[in-house]
Amino acid sequence: VGFVKHRAEEQPVAVHPIGCVSKERAGETLAEMASMAEEGAVAFSDDGAPVYNAGLMRRALEYSTMLDVPIINHMEEPTLNPDGHMHEGAVATRLGIPGIPACSEDAMIARDIELARITGGHVHVAHIATARGAELVRRAKSDGIRATAEVCTHHLALTDEAVEASGLSAHTKMHPPLRSAT
C-alpha cells in the first residue's frame, strides 16, 4: 500500500489503494488490515474472487468497523456455478453453455448484508448485476445497515443476448455475467 501511495504522488490523478481482505487473496487468513489502513488503504477486497468463507468475511467486517472502511466483495457463491460461463437462462440453454444462476450472486449479497447487520460493518457490493441484488441492498440501506453497491455500465447496457449476438465473443464473458432483461 505504501509503495502504491508513493508512486501515486507522481501521478496527475488521485489514487486510493484498496488492500486485500485475505493474505495473498487466498481466502483463508485475514490480511493485516490495520497496517494497510495506516499506510493509506481506503477499503479492502479480494475482488476477482469472492470472500467465500463466511467466518473470514465476518471478521473482516468486524475489523472494518474499527478502521471505518468498507469491505468490497465480489458477489458470486462459487459452489452454485462451478462450471458456468454465462447467465443461466434461455440464451445459455439455446447455446448449450453452462450457466451461472442469478441466485449465486443474490445469495452472497444476502449473506454479506446479514453479516454487516450483525457486525455494524460496511459491505460494498462490487459490480451488482441482478435486480434482486439491488433490491436487497436498497432494503438493507432502508433498515440502517451499512450496505452500498456499484454497477458496471455493461451490466446496464447489455443483456445475455449480447453473448449470442457477438458470436460468443470473449468480450461478452465476465463475472458476474451479463444477465437477462427479466
Predicted regions and their residues:
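Histidine/acidic residue-rich metal-binding segments in metalloenzymes
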Residues: 28-182
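Metal-associated gating/positioning segment near the N- to mid-region
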Residues: 1-10, 19
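Active-site beta->alpha loop and helix N-cap motifs at the rims of alpha/beta catalytic domains
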Residues: 20-26
